[in-house]
Amino acid sequence: MMQASITSILVVLTLVAQDRLAGGLEHKSYDYTKYHTMDEISAWMNQMQRENPDVVSTMTYGQTYEKRNITLLKIGFSSTTPKKAIWMDCGIHAREWIAPAFCQHFVKEVLGSYKTDSRVNMLFKNLDFYITPVLNMDGYIYSWLNNSTRLWRKSRSPCHENSTCSGTDLNRNFYANWGMVGISRNCCSEVYNGATALSEPEAEAVTDFLGAHQNHLLCYLTIHSYGQLILVPYGHPNISAPNYDELMEVGLAAAKAIKAVHGKSYKVGSSPDVLYPNSGSSRDFARLIGIPYSFTFELRDEGQHGFILPEDQIQPTCQEAYEGAMSIINYVHDKNFKNTAITVTATLWTTLMALWISTSHVF
């Protein structure tokens, strides 16, 4: 009987272990200093929701070409009325593994601090965060297959019948000066912009979501690599955003915040000015439909490792980029919620003064 009980317990423990492996490792053991497969990231997303049900929910807003659900994390305190929101997506280009790593880091940081950090708590009260850790899921999975696919960039949709090539550059497929500059009509090219604007279901899904929420979205952040850049609209050299000067000011402040962490310098400007002209980008589309603050982050490095950024650089890259992103988010928040920001600042100063007075009388 004793042997049977021990056997039963071992069976149960084995099943539990297998279930955890299938569903992803526990949050405490999730390694944010490593790159993760799509299955691991999906399990992590579910875990974030399970562990933080008061502030995290998942939303599926489309499917990839290979019929995978495109899912985001909605983060913030619940509200009976629609809230203003921040969008962040990572992994639109498959080979840029540091981008999904950053989205995960960002989520970890805000969820780990909103209960103790009054600033993040205020953001959660006034804003919702829509965060897609991997937009190009098909391409990302393909980039994990082997060394020959590691540098895959595009989606995985097929080209026309007479071509052996596949994939569209999703960041050339949005309806924003589509097909004008910085693209190719050759499907074998890495910057192939698709048969038509929004030919790709991934781009269409984002477009539909932004359209449905455009009156509430204040800021659009799309995370890429590499180059250490903060890019503002637009990718066309002859078109500037109406609030270009303000975007530059906000971007330069973010670059300053980034440099303060590990000393890394980020250039700020439009894509034609600091990188290359392009069209059909998600950043430009977001600005065109009226989302006032739209930025592309190109994370580390400057070409030493390129897309194969070593894992020992994940943490410092994410730490500095987090400060840059929060610099932008705080600016956007404070501009739209001035009274709230003043109240929090006053409360902070009152608390500091009280502490100073109390300690100044201690002899």
From Swiss-Prot:
It is an enzyme of class 3 (hydrolase). It comes from Danio rerio (Zebrafish). Zn(2+) binds at residues 93, 96, 224. Optimum pH is 6.5-7.5. N-glycosylated. It comes from the Eukaryota. Belongs to the peptidase M14 family. InterPro entries: Carboxypeptidase_O, Peptidase_M14. Expressed in intestinal epithelium. The active site is at 298 (proton donor/acceptor). This is Carboxypeptidase O. Carboxypeptidase which preferentially cleaves C-terminal acidic residues from peptides and proteins. Can also cleave C-terminal hydrophobic amino acids, with a preference for small residues over large residues. Residues 340-363 form a propeptide. Pfam families: Peptidase_M14. Its main location: membrane.
